[in-house]
Amino acid sequence: MDYNQEVVAAQISAMRFTDSDIAPDYQAISTVTHNGRHFSTWDRRFQILCDKLAKNPRYQQIIIPRGLWTLVAILDKDESKLYVMMTDQNLSARRHEVELKGFSTHYVYSLLFVNEGLEPVSEQLEMIPPLDDDKQEHRIKDLEKMLGDWVDQVSEVLIGSFEYGHGEIIGGSLNLFDDNYRLVDSVDLSEQILHPIEQGDVQSNPDIKPQPQEPIVKLRAKRRSQEDKEKKSNSDEK
């Protein structure tokens, strides 16, 4: 799958930031409640994403308000590809919603209308009946509202999804879905998460692809091994 390495590297940098990173700020405000902490984490992620790409005129930041929630999508104007990032947990929930209901008001589902006509690798979801006219119209209007003047500049939507464990990022993938969340293509981002490419390297050639090295399974095995060693060390100290 062709994709922009610079945008993906920026997504990974942004998604490394977690709730635990912002915890000290909230602890200074209150030791009782931390209302808004999750939203603040996402605000920081979007700021990191935008800061990483701000100097390159190739990219357009598209700010999308969704009620209490506001997200930032990145348009690669040279390739007409829109990049969105989310957690793997949320992506799974959104796909399941469409599988059950055949429709969703979630922003990703509306954006994926752009990918209508792409051929999925297999039938991951059961055959979904066509939307009725009202739902189809809602989806199209929602898409146009989100992308505004850029709607005709987007030919493909790519979803970066990221997995977390013990408060830190442990894996991820870049996914191309059809308009019903059926997988067309996917790239494992685990290697880039484990061994980040220097930003200067990807800026010189944003379309480079990383060479696969150690799989995420080995990373998890290493983590477990390290945790076992630490537990044994602590036990010996006691």
Model segments located where?
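Interdomain/boundary linker segments immediately adjacent to catalytic/signaling cores
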Residues: M1-S40
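A short acidic/basic microdomain associated with nuclease active sites
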Residues: L53-Y83
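Basic, glycine-/proline-tolerant helical and adjacent loop/strand elements
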Residues: M85-T87, S92-L100
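Catalytic cores of nucleic-acid endonucleases
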Residues: H96-S161
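Glycine-rich, aromatic-bearing surface loops/beta-hairpins
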Residues: K141-K238
